[in-house]
Amino acid sequence: MACVFPCQQGIVVGGGLAGMSAANTLLENGAKTVLIDKSSFCGGNSTKATSGINGSATRSQKNKGIEDSAQLFTADTLKGGAKRPELAELLCVNSGPDVEWLMDKFNLDLSLVARLGGHSAPRTHRGKERFPGMTITYALIQMVEKISEK
C-alpha cells in the first residue's frame, strides 16, 4: 500500500482476503474507503481456500513445539515456480505476523497447523471450521461492514 497514515482516502481493488485486509486497515485508520470488486459479492478466490493460510514462526506453531522460520519458508517457496527472491522473502517474513493479526484482530481460531505439500515444516493454519478461507474472509467482510456503519 502506497499510503502512509494518516491517509484520508483510499481505493481498494478486489474483495478477497488481501482487499479486505487493506480495506479494514484503511477504515480502521479513519480513511474514506471505496472497495471495488468484479463480482456481485466479496470474498474472491480466498473463500474457496480449503486448506488454510500459511504462516511461519507463529504462536500456534510455537505452542505445538513446531520449529519454523521465515528463512525456511522462503527457501521452500523459492523451490517452486518463478524465482522472485525479494517478493518471496517479503511474503514469508510477513506471513507469521499476518496470521497472528487475523487471529487477534478478528478473533479467528487458526490454532490447527498442518504440513502440506512443498513445505518442510507444518505451517498451514486453520481452525475447526470446515472451510477456513470462507471463515477468514467473511470475518474481514463483517468487520468492514461494521466499521462502515459508523
What residue ranges belong to the model's regions?
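A short, basic/flexible loop-to-alpha-helix module at the beginning of a structural domain
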Residues: 1-7
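Conserved N-terminal/central alpha/beta ligand/cofactor-binding core
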Residues: 2, 31-32, 38-150
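Short, well-ordered alpha-helix to beta-strand connector turns
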Residues: 7-8, 50
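N-terminal Rossmann-like FAD-binding beta1-loop-alpha1 element of flavoenzymes
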Residues: 8-35
